[in-house]
A protein has these predicted regions:
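Short cytosolic juxtamembrane segments of multi-pass membrane proteins
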Residues: 1, 364-379, 785-791
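Membrane transport/envelope proteins' first extracytoplasmic loop
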Residues: 1-256, 265-268, 290, 501, ...
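Interfacial "coupling" helices/loops that link adjacent transmembrane helices in transporter permeases
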Residues: 6, 10-13, 255-299, 374-377, ...
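Alpha-helical transmembrane segments, especially those used as permease/efflux helices
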Residues: 9-20, 30, 239-242, 255, ...
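Membrane interfacial helix motifs at helix-loop boundaries and amphipathic/re-entrant anchors
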Residues: 34-48, 61-63, 223-253, 308-343, ...
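Small-residue-rich transmembrane alpha-helices
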Residues: 263, 296-326, 339-364, 399-403, ...
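Juxtamembrane segments of multi-pass membrane proteins
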Residues: 420, 425-426, 432-576, 581-594
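C-terminal transmembrane helical bundles of large multi-pass transporters
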Residues: 467, 628-631, 645-784, 790-791
Length: 791
């Protein structure tokens, strides 16, 4: 017959497993629903054209999203004419874009574009008031900007601020000028929209357009026009996908960890019950089936609740991702019935996998365990566990050594492997480490030889399994929290130092509220500027980041600048395309024209761009290009009028802020990962401590009968929890330390700079304090209830 205390202990452990499985399945369901939702929409400014023709795609690399290479000017015009002659087509309109932004506004990336007025026919919106632009100083703007026809407006362009008169307003984003003025500011043509006669079948026109285009483009109609959504949105969705995938995998892994540790501790506490079942004839197979049945029941209920919770919270999670920058604005999640079903099945499988070791341990209980009264763990470490723990620790040690000598690509993987292996190894070896480590940590208690101090020390050393089960989740959380946050912080500081050390300049002029510096702003700076653009090289016309530089480039980067028909490339680009110094490289530029340029130098891959061209070459072929930064090389500060939207800052400050948006996303990603792992730790710690406290009612009763006051009982339990959390934190730091020191050494070798370890103390303190607070609350509060019920 099962006692009330045993039943309470069992249901407490079941509750922890239920919550772990439910949360894991909820996270997997939400992540899968968002990942499988396309979320892309046809751009408003092109949605009015039933058929769109897109230029052929170039070679794309993972995580890098660039626009397709434009058609050559002559090819684009010939294709436009041929498409315009198709039956049912009223006109074929080329779409061009250039940088435009009303002064003193900070708009989203997709709204910082100007177009020729002819392209307004492709939009699904039209004029709200006023008329189209007729002269070069007239412009049509989005009415949400607050301008009315006849008002003057200053628009920032690549040339500098331009004064216009508003001739009309539209019900959608964008700036529209005369076609002639747009041709001077815009680059090449990537899209041609077909306007059809009323009643014309778009499918039939699309089929005819495909025959006319052949391999020179892609014909899009209907929902396939979503492929023309801004590449920035595609990149944002890709980043969000990486975040969701990492969170889902981490949730599945930690769910197995929590279920396994919780059931292992529960089985260890039910040895007497299992021994009694063996005494009355139960076979080992029946005991194993019993544990699996309990896990199946808990897993099924938890998975069902988690799948339902994931479906309900998926829209809320989508909103959070949009606000954080991991999904584009307007993204919507679509529900698919099979996703929660698959997540439910995954949750059940995870619960059964997690209980495997516990079921084997239950099947090995002997009938004599029914006679056992003491909570002493005579054999907390089995030979198999000791071998597995030493093997995992050895793998972690090898990975830590490899981290110190690995390159940049393998550095992160080896660091993560070091932490995971050491965490697993120390968790397996924890029962053997508890005695010596607890002895060292509780040595100060020996100076106060009172009953509570003795009980704290002996309880932890005697009940090794209980102590180890509580240590494990704290160890894992501290290890991963310290590793992730400190690695990110150390890497960012090292990257900032690398960028600052590579530049020889007095100061940096950077854009304020705009995506780049105009020619007017750059002209004020006595030094070197980097005119950002994209070029396409090789047979696959791979997109390459490029910059136009002037003669002052050599003073800043100590690299001879390209001049005339020459180009400078990085070593990785040269190796990928087979370019060597003195050879000729064929590059397609932003207006679609191809130029053959001689390679004059091959530079290190640490340079900020892959290709460097003469500045006038970039400006001739990309009228809308903007400079990311201009470095001042003279002692005197640069006077910058407010209308140029630029500021002068130190080189170190620019290096720290250069990747500010990327760093923000990285830290949000880090926060999400730490929050997920810390959340599961809260479940594991609370479940384990509650289970342990529920099973210690008899210990509390004995303490009271022995003369201990309620305050002494609570102090004993709280002190024991504090020591266990301290042990977990110490082992967690021990697991993360080799990976961190190896990473620092690897960065020093890779960058050739004095990189210092930067520990994220606020994160470490917060995680340890959270574990301590939660563990203490989960111990003291139930104990207070027990004390009130005792006579």
């Amino acid at each position: 017959m099962i006692s009330l205390a045993t039943a309470r202990e069992r249901w407490t452990s079941f509750l922890g497993c239920f919550v772990a499985v439910a949360l894991g399945v909820a996270v997997v369901t939400m992540s899968a629903l968002v990942l499988l939702s396309d979320g892309a929409k046809v751009p408003e400014r092109l949605a009015g054209a039933p058929v769109l023709v897109q230029s052929p795609a170039g070679t794309q690399t993972g995580g890098v999203f660039t626009e397709n290479p434009p058609w050559a000017p002559q090819s684009a015009e010939e294709l436009r004419r041929e498409l315009a002659r198709l039956p049912g087509v009223v006109d074929a309109v080329p779409d061009r874009s250039f940088y435009a932004q009303a002064a003193d506004t900070e708009q989203r990336r997709g709204e910082r574009q100007g177009h020729p007025w002819s392209a307004a026919a492709l939009a699904e919106y039209g004029l709200s008031e006023g008329r189209p632009p007729v002269t070069a100083d007239e412009i049509v703007v989005d009415r949400s900007l607050g301008f009315t026809p006849g008002e003057p407006v200053t628009v920032l362009t690549a040339r500098g601020p331009q004064r216009f008169s508003v001739s009309g307003t539209m019900n959608g984003p964008g700036y529209y000028v005369t076609d002639r003025w747009a041709a001077e500011l815009a680059g090449g043509v990537r899209t041609i929209g077909l306007l059809l006669e009323s009643g014309t079948d778009a499918t039939r026109v699309a089929a005819a357009a495909r025959r006319a285009v052949g391999g020179d483009g892609t014909v899009l109609t209907g929902a396939s026009r979503e492929a023309l959504a801004p590449k920035q949105d595609e990149m944002t969705r890709w980043i969000g996908g990486q975040v969701l995938t990492a969170i889902a995998l981490l949730s599945a892994f930690v769910t197995v960890f929590v279920v396994s540790s919780t059931f292992a501790f529960a089985v260890a506490g039910r040895r007497r019950e299992f021994g009694l079942l063996r005494t009355i004839g139960a076979t080992p197979r029946q005991l194993k089936r019993l544990v699996y049945g309990e896990a199946l029941a808990v897993g099924a209920v938890g998975a069902a609740a988690g799948a339902l919770l994931g479906v309900v919270l998926a829209p809320t999670m989508t909103g959070v991702l949009i606000d954080a920058g991991f999904q584009p604005a307007g993204f919507e999640v679509s529900l698919r019935w099979w996703v929660p079903v698959a997540a439910f099945a995954t949750g059940v499988v995870v619960a059964l996998v997690g209980v495997g070791a516990a079921s084997r341990r239950a099947s090995r209980v002997k009938p004599l365990e029914a006679m056992r009264e003491a909570a002493v763990d005579n054999r907390p470490m089995t030979r198999r566990r000791r071998v597995a723990g030493l093997a995992a620790t050895g793998v972690g040690a090898v990975c830590s050594v490899g981290t110190a000598f690995a390159g940049a690509d393998a550095l992160v993987l080896l660091a993560l492997g070091t932490a995971m292996s050491l965490t697993t190894g120390l968790t397996l070896l924890a029962p053997g480490l508890v005695g010596p480590v607890i002895g060292a940590l509780t040595r100060p208690l020996a100076r106060h030889p009172g009953a509570p101090a003795v009980l704290v020390r002996e309880n932890m050393i005697t009940a090794v399994r209980r102590t180890s089960a509580t240590v494990a989740p704290v160890l894992a959380t501290v290890a991963f929290a310290v590793l992730i946050t400190s690695t990110v912080q150390t890497t960012q500081n090292a990257d900032t130092a690398r960028q600052a050390a590579a530049v020889r300049a007095e100061a940096a002029v950077v854009p304020r509220g705009t995506p780049g510096l105009s020619d007017a702003a750059v002209a004020r700076v006595e030094g070197a500027s980097l005119l950002s653009t994209t070029v396409y090289g090789g047979d696959g016309r791979a997109a390459l980041s490029a910059a136009g530089v002037s003669s002052a480039f050599e003073r800043v980067y100590a690299v001879p600048p390209p001049q005339g028909d020459t180009v400078v490339v990085t070593a990785a680009v040269a190796a990928a395309h087979g370019w060597r110094k003195g050879q000729v490289a064929s590059l397609t530029l932003e207006d679609g024209r191809t130029r053959r340029l001689r390679v004059t130098a091959v530079v290190d891959d640490s340079m900020p761009y892959q290709v460097f061209l003469p500045r006038d070459v970039v400006r001739d072929h990309d009228p809308s290009a903007l400079a990311d930064v201009a470095y001042r090389t003279t002692p005197a500060p640069t006077p910058l009028p407010a209308g140029l939207s630029a500021d002068e800052i130190s080189v170190e400050a620019y290096a720290a802020s250069d990747d500010a948006e990327e760093d923000r996303l990285v830290w949000i990603f880090t926060l999400l990962l730490v929050a997920v792992s810390a959340g599961y730790t809260a479940i594991a710690v609370a479940s384990t401590v509650l289970t342990a406290t529920a099973g210690r009612v008899r210990d509390v009763r004995v303490l009271r009968l022995s003369g201990a006051t309620p305050r002494q009982v609570l102090l004993t339990l709280a002190a024991e929890t504090c020591c266990v959390v301290a042990l977990g934190a110490a082992l967690g730091l021990a697991a993360a330390a080799p990976a961190l020191f190896g990473t620092v050494h690897g960065l020093r070798e890779e960058l050739g700079l004095p990189v210092e370890l930067s520990l994220a103390w606020p994160w470490l303190t917060g995680v340890v304090a959270g574990c301590l607070l939660l563990g203490t609350a989960a111990t003291v509060l139930p104990a207070r209830v027990v004390l009130r019920r005792l006579p």
